[in-house]
Regions:
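Short, basic phosphate-binding NTP loop
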Residues: 2-103
Length: 103
């Protein structure tokens, strides 16, 4: 379990809260949307061939606690879904993941 409340998690990650979710704590972080489920924070990393942020909506549909994506994807996701998932935005999701690893 990630032992950080949502606002502290965002602060540690250097991320902005774009939309608040329902649950205060997430259980784990994942970078593969196919593995995302209830309680997970999906982090959309940009790769050589794919931008993981494109799959954040899939993670939310799978019940993810929230998503951490770049600002463009964050703006797109702000109004998506029923409002259960947190949407966090960071200019560099990879750096945010590293910061969470140190927190």
């Amino acid at each position: 379990m990630i032992d950080l409340a949502a606002e502290r998690l965002a602060a540690e990650a250097g991320a902005e809260i774009v939309r608040r979710g329902r649950s205060e704590f997430c259980e784990r972080a994942v970078v593969d949307s196919r593995e995302a489920g209830r309680g997970d924070l999906f982090i959309g990393l940009a790769g050589e061939h794919l931008d993981g942020g494109r799959f954040a909506s899939d993670a939310m549909s799978a019940g993810a606690w929230g998503v951490l994506v770049d600002p463009d994807h964050g703006a797109d996701l702000a109004g998506e879904g029923a409002g259960e998932a947190w949407v966090l935005s960071s200019p560099d999701p990879e750096r945010s993941l590293q910061a969470l690893g140190r927190a």
